[in-house]
Amino acid sequence: MEMQSRVLVTGAAGFIGFHLASRLLERGCQVTGIDNMNDYYDVDLKEERLKRLTEHERFRFERMDIADADALKNLFEKDDPEIVINLAAQAGVRYSITNPDSYIRSNIIGFYNVLECCRHSKEKGRKGIRHLVFASSSSVYGANKKVPYSVQDPVDHPVSLYAATKKSDELMAYAYSRLYGIPTTGLRFFTVYGPMGRPDMAYFGFADKMVRGETIQIFNYGDMYRDFTYIDDVVAGVESVAKRPPEEDEDGVKYKVYNIGNHRPESLMYFVETLEKCLMKAGVISEPARKEFLPMQPGDVYRTYADVTELERDFGFSPDMPLEEGMQRFADWYAEYVRRK
């Protein structure tokens, strides 16, 4: 990405948003971050991320919900971003089953507002955006039987509302790109983990329970597989993609979708055993956790597995962090995190 590029990162106090904004600031970009700072998980962790970002003189933050159309419009007019990276979303598959309203508000209405602001970004003499990058999710593949998951595969049968909203985002983004010429790229992330992560994610929640000596719940009796992808690999992928807006396809549309995943699924049981070993090495726990084995939960899928052929072809990049090394990095950070709490 060019030095001094003006980049808007939505969801900047979130897990991926924080790490991405940090990387862009290191590259010399001018970064505006927005976040609604909701309490879906520990706000203190979001505040800590934000505190680190605001130490950079080229970072500016506004507390804002992308569902607030007027506030977002004013921000675009004031900052005139060149690149927009939309990471703001209501996350979580299981939470969407009992709290659908927040997913429609953030993931549908909020993303529509982002698209509208991009559509009108060249008005009033502004340069306008040259690339919109947005977070989709591996959850759009639903219960697809074919693996690895390719961006060419049909994704018409979501098994959660969260997945349905992410697929809806892809459809809306394509329509806006086709109608208004907005260069747009969607990124399907696969089970992102790492330091300063989301407490609602399994690895973080398991670590919390292990520290408290509580029993951890293993769904589908441990017979599940996830394509665990380390945060630095995800950030590197987003950065690579953001630098290069898509070329026109045969229909004249500047729109692409890529998987960003480690393309090496690991079993849930191996993941838990690895987490235990890393936490013991970091001095966080002294013995393995007690485990309760349960059936598959609604909204869950048996396996995720990324085909990153298109990412490798177009950018010469694919994630490669081994789970063992990435999880140790998380455990070492978590040890400090626990001591501070």
Regions found by a protein language model. Give the residues of each.
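Hydrophobic alpha-helix immediately C-terminal to the catalytic Tyr-X-X-X-Lys motif of short-chain
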Residues: 168, 172, 176, 206, ...
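N-terminal Rossmann-like NAD(P)+-binding domain of SDR-like oxidoreductases, especially those catalyzing
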Residues: 1-192, 235, 317, 333, ...
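C-terminal substrate-binding subdomain of Rossmann-fold SDR/epimerase-dehydratase oxidoreductases
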Residues: 208-341
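Conserved GTPase G-domain signal focused on the G5
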Residues: 196
